[in-house]
Amino acid sequence: MIQITIDVILEDPTLCVVQLYTQVSSQTVFALLSDGSLAVLYPNDNNALVLASKTSMANQLPVDILRKVITTDEGQVQVPITALACHPFVENLVVVGFKDASFSIWFPTDSDPSYKTELHQEELCLIKWLSHGRILVTCDVSGQVILYKFSTDTYSFESITKTRKSGHVVDIVERTCCTDNIIYSIDQEHSDHPIDVSNYAGVGLCEFIVMWSKGDVAVLTDNGVIRHIGTVNLSAGHALLYKLYYWSCSDTCCAISTSGDMFLFGFKTLAVGAYKDILAKYKIEYKRENGIVQLPATKIAYMAPSDGQLRVLSLLTQEVAYIDLEDHIENFVGVNGGLAVIRDYGILIPLRGKNGYAVVSCHRSTGSCDSNGNEGMHILAASDHYLHANDMRFARVQDSNGPSSGPRIRPGSDEFIVTEQHFLHAENPRCSYANIYMSQIVVGDNSFSQTMITNYSITNRNVVSNKMLPIFHDEGGKPINLPPGFSPETASTPEGVDDATIDSFSAEIISSRGKFVSLLLFSFEPKDMQVAYANNTNSAIMAQDLTGEGLTHMKFLDQKFTDSRNSFISAVLIGARIIKVSVNTNANLLQEHTLEIKHPIKKISILTNPLTSVSSDNLSGFVLAFGDNVFTVFEVAIGKVPHLAGSFKLDERYTYVADCVLYGRYILASQNSRADLESDYLKVEIVKYSITGSKAGSLVLSDDPTHGATVERIARMTLVNQHLFMINNNLSLFYTDCKTFNSVVKITDIGQLMFNTNIYCAYLEEEDLDDIHLSTPDTGSPAVEAEESPQRQTREEKIKDLLLVENTMQINQQLHDRIKQERKEQNVISVYTTLPTLIPLDTICVQSCNATITLDNAHHVLFTVVFKGYNVVTGLPCLLPYVVALSIDTKILGEMISAGLTATPSQPTEKVGSRPTTGSDGGSAVLKSRIFDMAPYTVTNAIPDCFGNIGLELVLSTSLNLLFVGSSMLFALKTGTFTKRALSSKNLSAYLSWLDSKEKGSQRNADLVFQQEKYEDQISLLQSIYISSEQRAKVPLLVQSLAETTISMNDRIKGSWLDFNDKIFLSIQGVFAPYVNSKLETLMQPLSSTMLTLLSPAFVFSERSGKSEKPRTSNFVSINSDRLTIKNLTALGSSKKTGFQQSCTATYALNKFTICSSNGQLAEAYSHVLVSENLHVWRSLATLCIQNGYVDLLKTCTTHLKSPILSLLMRLVTNRKRSDAADTGQDQLKTKLAPQDELLLALLSIALGASAQGLDRLQGKPLLLSGVMNDIGLSIRYLMSDGAHSSLQQTGGLTSLAKKSSILSLANRLIHLNDLESSKICYSEVYKAPVAAQGEIDSLNANPQQLLQQNESVQFLNDEYKKKGVAACLTLAKKGTDPQFLYVAARMIESEAKSRDVKSDIPGKMKDELDQQTLWLEAARLYKRCSAFTHALACALKCEDDELIYNIGTTSQSQRLSLVAATYFSNKYKSGLITISEKGRDNVSEDFCDELQATIEHALVLYKSAGLGAQSLELCIKSNRMKELSNLLADILSEPSKSLDRELDDDVVLQEQSTTTQGTGDVLQGISSDLLLRAGRALLDVSPEDYSLNDYNSFIRTAVIALAKASAYQDALQAILDGKIQISERIADILTPASIEHDEEAVRVTETLGKLLHKAGLYQSAVKKFILAQNHTLAINSLIKQGDPMKVIKFANMARQKQVYIAASNFLQTLDWRSNPTYMKAIISFYEKANSLENIAKFFANCAAEEISEYHDYVKAKQAIIEAMNRQKVAIDYVEQNASSKESEKVATARAAKVASLKKTLQAYEQNGKLIHAFLQLCDFARDTSQAHDSSETLTTNSSKLLTAVRKMENCYVKPGDIMGLLAEFHGVRGEKARIVSIIKDMCNEGIDPENYLAADLYAAHAAEAGLTVVNKALELEDIDLTAEKSDH
């Protein structure tokens, strides 16, 4: 379930997030920023990630920015962060590595952290926590690796070892397969002493695999031992190692290089220090941009180079699964960024241009399933008090299926399919983004909580430097470790963002946001408080009990109770603040609402209104959402929109709320309170609030006079009607009545119930059981009948009787007598057998609890509780495998509350089922108790239902197995300790004891002594950790078992099959079954499903993942693919129907029947259904009997159903002859079914509507079915004629059965009448294709020919042949249609043809018979009719019938036969050519030539049918048949040349040409390059005069493609140069060589193609070819010709070549660069990058000139000319400084000339600068002294001097008109008109237009006086600008 979308908000818009790190143990997020600093982020009230100091965590996380600043000579400099690692469980502890080789262990409370600087000399590139946070490793870019031992108590560390190899460190992984064996095995032997994990760190029990980029791989042990694995031989070129993956379940490691080299290795044994085992070396082709991701089961996933295919490679078997994304995703363009994976959820693929991603999930075809499909789940009765579901160590299997001997794995290929698509919400007002990049996946512990971090590309074009991550390049210069979207220099806009998208965003948005990162949390954690479900069943039972009528009365169960059960309200948390509420009524009216809460949600509670009438579909209720001490209540009702009923908040400073439930219109809250902020939360109370927040009452527990302050905080509560059950942190169970709400009573101590071993039962020792072990197959047979005498019991029955709980007291006494006292404790069965000491007892607390009233008694409550604990190794909470179920009498509790007593639990040694008595002592409120142990499964939730069943949600993962097994997966599988889903009878302790006895029984040899010497250090280490001497003695055995457990390839493959997590919904039917054995039924579900409730006979759950035809799509803002799903328990009803359709009466009866029958108590089982007259009960029971093969009970059910059809079927089938195989002496449930019983079950299942099961039984028995159908056909039709048609309609498939029996009878009669054609039609009607949808009988696998062979048709044919000869036989055969009949006739005729000798004399009596050729022909035709094509072709060749041979060759669909026929025609054609050459063409008839042409055409077609294209081409070339050659060649190359008017645009051809895939090799298989070359040249040599224009053009196109396939590029290019075909983009792509690298000829061809495209005006295509040929100069020229400036800029940035930079700058200067700052920046930047300093100076000089000539802006001109002078000086210095004393005289002379030229240009720039400066000084003087009396003369004099200087200088930038205009303006201010007129005249005399240099008003006022005409420009109508008017409308 995708829960939350979190945005990262940074205050500084120039910063962007480069990488994020999350921590499982906290909600803190650490973000590495682009400036090299670390930000500490935390979700705020709006669920956005902001700096922690701005949230409620400000006190705990006061320092939210970490920057290391050092002082240098240049001042203060920030040192960027280059690596970071969060501790696995210590909250907010991180290790930060810096670029200066230092690192720091830092808490966000430390504002001045200390730095370790002496350990590394180069910048850190990798930091990791290993060994569950006890080992720290730091790596730097020089290849140095340092291991440290870390103390989680003092937060200190000490160095263990260091090593260094060539290249940087790619990764380091822990070899958990061997190290887990040590830790978890020691844990199993530690008894009651808690484990201290710190003892195991740094002593040599852990191994780590390290990989360096240059190819070295080594293993480090945590005590400093270094073991070199090897050096990976990388491909030549620029390949580096960049991925290291490890799989614990198969102990396999894989190193992958950048070029796809795979190095797969493992270890020969499971011991520490084992030798390497190289498994495989091979190479893959993948797309680097998308990366490689690790999958379970030793698999990896990557994108193929074509970008449209996802490949999943199994490394051990080298099998590849493909999925073409374009087949599943509409408008698929490509993959955008790196792949990501979430374990057991799917592969996440970001989609280019779609703003979203797709999920590819795996549907496994492997698994271990028993006969019931229950995945190996069995109930094992250890006692009446303690039951195992998977533990086979001490208990005997009571289930009839028997224990699983081992994991029955069926290997198969997994199927990968696109299951979901999600798209980004495009209306986020705070940011703008284009495409998604997935930069990280952070996986939480045990797969419960997984976070996907997605990095969205920016639209901001600001340059953001990436200062922090160390960047590693391969030898080709490509970065191999950057996050997607980052280039080495900048975080620029990634591909796929077009200009229109960028332009559409406002400047404010672009400037306010940098890179944008979002977190999507995939939460698979236990959701016991995040889902809720409620209906009115409990209130209905209470109301029925008040009436005094029975609870099991049919009227109540099928009406009121059914209505209450089928109407419900459910709620599921789908986001941090979003709840999906579903309201379902009895009429299947489903209404869904999405509620958005303003605060985070911790708990959901639902209460339905019992006063609403569910039958009228007006169900209503309340939904409570609690979180952050805020209570929000919504009222929901069917047909109405939910509305807010109330909301209030408690002050978290004084109140802590642990749990809450709804009670009517009140809220009951379990809270701890305190009076002031200085005190502790001492007050424990249950407070009753109204939904609006007013306090209505309080029940204080800590002030209770009985218990005092011993009551701990109430952790969980559950409410049943008015009964409130509460569990505190000490696992004590309390009760109160909410009506009175004035006192509380303690019911029992659940912790004592679980951990007190005195109440468990002890059993026989293993050796004693082995002495009397009986291996009869009937291990699960029921108990002996009561009437049998004890003396007649067998030994097995005695043992079995000991295991039954009726004799529990007697068992204990016998065991005390038989078993030694010192061994008793070892054989006690309790939760200690599966609870590891990794979980201390004092950390176990309640996970969830639920309760409901049962239908057996309205005062009996079925209560369940599941647990969680603290794992001291991982430092995190974990679920436990136990469920405690209690049956509690609320009536007794009420009496005890009145009397002020405490409830006491009943002793489990009492006989189950005996009712406790109530007396003056208060009696016992706990009637029954039972503990279920599901190890190695862990329990998420346990929900009881009113029928006395429990639904469990179980999770099993490979990591969780270790907690409850004590060994790694491979070791357990090899030694038989356990199989993935079940603990074995030979556990680790038993295995070591067996190994010890085996060694003692044999003399110790030298090998064992050698083993001990080799592992002496490891043995001594382990013995120092152990406590007792007995444990120390087992250490050598343990080490020996690990060292001798060799691992083969098959072992690794077997282990990888089990490498996946799964979830099971398990129903326990009969929680307190009186015969020990409960009935289990499992439902496998994906990890993302959540159980809502169990409503027998159906599970109700929220399901997300699943295989579907069309992927589900959703939106990131409200991602909600979850759907409400209902699935049936097959033991209680049909799997085809929804469980709610079954009546509750039937469910109740079948539930009791199932429990009793599974324990062998058939009499009691039958009594539960006998009292019922409900036809639903008997019908469902009949279906159940059919499923289990209960034939005798099925007959009873049919009697109670009172159906004449079923009675008729029963009578007809049972009257048939019974088989001798039936053994009437056995129990009816275990009797082997006779054939007629199988038939009866099949027919009755069809009659009852379960047609699928019936048809399965009928498979392969069509003849037996035919006889029964004949028998019952007439009877059924008789019943229909008698008016029983309505009852027949109710029997489902029998209507079809009657029809088919009639047709079958008719078919049999037609056979005897020799009407073969009609009988065949009848048989086809009976045995037609499946029509399962209509319930008809299908797939009977009957062969009509088998029935036809039984008649006399074949014999009749033989008689005709013998009597009348072959002619009569042939006449008869021509009328036949049956293949078998035709085949026999053809054999007869063929035999007759073989016996004829045409050369011998034919007797007179035979002259009228058929000749041999005719017989061969007729035999061939008959063989062809019966599809015997091989015989037909042989006969046709005998008679040389061309048409028949051609027909057989083309229709047989056999390549072999097509080849034979083609050879025949080819030989015939060659013979014809010889005949023509001998006789001459003029002497050959025209018909002969036409026949020869037909022969060659036949041969060509047949060669093609045979898949031999090469022979066809050879034949066409030799026969000079160009048109056929072109067509054949086009078909082979998939070229549509037959379409005369179509362009060369076939995508298949282009795809095959552009990618060297295997498919191309398949198409051209068998056709050599030489043949393609000859064929292409032959087509090119065709004269255009001999063929039409269309044909000729088709020849040329096909020839070009063929030549390209043959790599004859020069010939193909010559055809283009000769003008035979025009160049196009498609043709250019075809002619482009597949591999250009290191191939000069290929480069020349590619360049030639580019030039041809350039010449043809196809500039974009030419650019592609030039880039491919690495000729960037030609590429930029084509781009310039295309005229797109943005493309020119992008290409220049990409090419990074001097000539390209200069060409781009020159082109941009031809554009309007002044109005587009981007162009100007690019021009300057390109010149700088090209180091073209002279051009930069020239550009600035041109800027200065243009500023003056166009805009008269001398201020900007001055700035530009100054910049030009500075650049010119730099250019001069650069040329002078590069001079060398060794250079030649010619070079020195050229350099001197260059310097002189540059200095001359500089002199011109300086002179222009001086003149511009002088003019500006004149302007300043004129402005400042305009009113001074003597200023006029001064200004005139200076202006004259300046004009003289300007006129003397060539190419002067200063314009004389500007100087004279300045004088005119000056005199105009002073009012001196005469001088103005004089200046205007002077300007005219010098050819200067005064209008361009004077102000318009000044010129207009004085022009006339100067003799100039002033034109009055009247405003014409068409010149009026209307743009201003438009805005008004």
From Swiss-Prot:
Chief localization: other
Spell out the residue ranges making up region: Disordered.
774-795
Which keywords has UniProt assigned to this entry? Cell projection, Cilium, Cilium biogenesis/degradation, Cytoplasm, Cytoskeleton, Flagellum, Leucine-rich repeat, Repeat, WD repeat
Task: Please state where this protein is localized.
Answer: Cell projection, Cilium, Flagellum; Cytoplasm, Cytoskeleton, Flagellum axoneme; Cytoplasm, Cytoskeleton, Flagellum basal body
> Any one cellular component term from GO for this entry?
axoneme
LRR repeat feature ranges: 957-980, 1019-1044, 1510-1532
Q: What's the domain of life for this entry?
A: Eukaryota
State any GO BP term from the record. Answer: intraciliary anterograde transport
Which parts are the WD repeats? 76-116, 119-158
**Which PANTHER family does the UniProt record give?**
IFT140/172-RELATED, INTRAFLAGELLAR TRANSPORT PROTEIN 140 HOMOLOG
Q: What does this protein do?
A: Component of the intraflagellar transport complex A (IFT-A) involved in flagellar assembly.
Name the record gives this protein = Intraflagellar transport protein 140
Which species is this UniProt entry from?
Giardia intestinalis (strain ATCC 50803 / WB clone C6) (Giardia lamblia)
